[in-house]
Regions:
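Short beta-strand/loop motif that positions the catalytic acidic residue
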Residues: 268, 274-276, 280
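Active-site loop/oxyanion-hole signature of alpha/beta-hydrolase fold enzymes
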Residues: 65, 72, 110-152
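Conserved alpha/beta-hydrolase catalytic His-Asp/Glu region
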Residues: 188-192, 203-266
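Short alpha-helix in the alpha/beta-hydrolase fold that links the catalytic acid
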Residues: 261, 270, 284-292
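Alpha/beta-hydrolase fold catalytic core
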Residues: 2-18, 23-81, 104-106, 328-341
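Catalytic active-site module of serine/aspartate enzymes centered on a nucleophile-bearing elbow/loop
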Residues: 298-341
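Conserved HGGG/HGGXW glycine-rich cap/lid loop of the alpha/beta-hydrolase fold
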Residues: 73-118
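Flexible "cap/lid" loop of the alpha/beta hydrolase fold
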Residues: 166-167, 173-205
Length: 341
């Protein structure tokens, strides 16, 4: 296992940087187009849009069947494609700080999963992980993303990435799993042992957002009161959809066991990078080693010291110190295979 130190990540970055990070944290950004936003909401949205632009991303939408996808896209379509998948109660904007390192040399696609962000689904939508993976596949096809593609998933997004790679092995060039969800023998947090406890992380009333930050991040950033209230309000509005996702995770845990989950993961042979925050309170760090044992072609896990469940927000520079060389290695190996007579 590789261990890295964040070297005083709390060396308080400038207020603007902290604010940008804060606005990304677990952002759930559904706002009805017919709903009038107040000044704080508009400022909040403007900050997120500026962050996307700073990362080289543009906001787009695409209707595929009964899902109207909201997604960010950046980089040249002639470059290798990366698909980044957000976690529970997250959104595409969770990846912005990572994406700015990627859009120069890669074609980056970051959708809002159904149930998060601005993606629109019917009231009776099936939020099960298998259906999310299938809908994501339909999105990839409709967006004309030429495979195989690199796939990265954080938390719940990791579970979806694993299922996607298992179902579509020839369309998966590599996997990057960040504090990935799943069903594990080494589960040692209340949220893994009994997913019903995930309901405690729902932001359904005032004060819940502060609790969520403390549970998911080792060193939560400062958030100005006005922006905290705006973020909390948006997440409260999103709570019914998040609740449906949690209900599906509870149901999944009753159907699948660590053994059946292992059967899936053992079929995956895509090159895999596993990265974890050592202080993750949601999915304990021991899971990283279990995933390494299950996956055929995984590198030794990278463990980040003084980081919680959100490395892509808490320590994006350390994340990219690992991910960029991994991507280059995969691309180089593939090129050598295609040029070998």
């Amino acid at each position: 296992m590789t261990r890295l130190s964040t070297s005083i990540m709390a060396s308080m970055k400038k207020t603007a940087t902290a604010l940008t990070l804060a606005c990304s944290v677990l952002s759930v950004m559904i706002i009805s187009q017919t709903q009038a936003a107040d000044n704080i909401d508009m400022t909040f949205q403007n900050v997120l849009q500026q962050e996307r632009s700073w990362a080289g991303l543009q906001s787009k939408s695409l209707k595929v069947g009964d899902v109207t996808w909201s997604y960010s896209e950046g980089g040249s379509t002639t470059k290798p494609t990366l698909l980044l998948i957000n976690g529970l109660a997250g959104s595409r904007d969770n990846w912005n700080r990572v994406a700015r390192y990627l859009t120069t040399n890669y074609h980056v696609i970051i959708p809002d999963l159904p149930g998060s962000g601005e993606t629109i689904v019917p009231q009776d939508f099936d939020y099960s992980v298998p259906n999310l993976a299938e809908k994501l596949r339909r999105f990839v096809e409709a967006a004309n993303l030429k495979g195989p593609i690199h796939i990265a998933g954080h938390s719940l997004g990791g579970s979806i990435a694993l299922l996607y790679a298992g179902q579509y092995p020839f369309e998966t060039k590599s996997l990057f799993l960040v504090d990935s969800g799943g069903i594990f023998r080494s589960a040692n947090t209340i949220y893994l042992k009994d997913p019903a406890y995930l309901k405690q992380l729902l932001v359904s009333k005032k004060g819940d957002f502060n609790y969520l930050l403390k549970q998911t991040m080792f060193n939560p950033p400062f958030i100005p009161k006005e922006f905290l209230q705006a973020q909390e309000k948006l997440m409260i509005d999103q709570a019914p959809q998040t609740q449906k996702l949690v209900d599906q995770l509870i149901a999944l845990n009753k159907v699948y066991t660590p053994d059946s989950f292992a059967v899936l993961t053992k079929t995956i042979d895509a090159p895999t990078l596993i990265l974890w925050g050592k202080q993750d309170k949601i999915i304990n760090v021991e899971v990283a080693s279990e995933l390494k044992r299950l996956l055929k072609n995984a590198q030794p896990p990278v463990i980040l010291e003084n980081v919680g469940h959100m490395p892509i927000l808490e320590a994006e520079q350390l994340v990219m110190q690992q991910y960029l060389p991994f991507l280059l290695k995969v691309e180089t190996n593939q090129s050598s295979k295609t040029t070998t007579p």
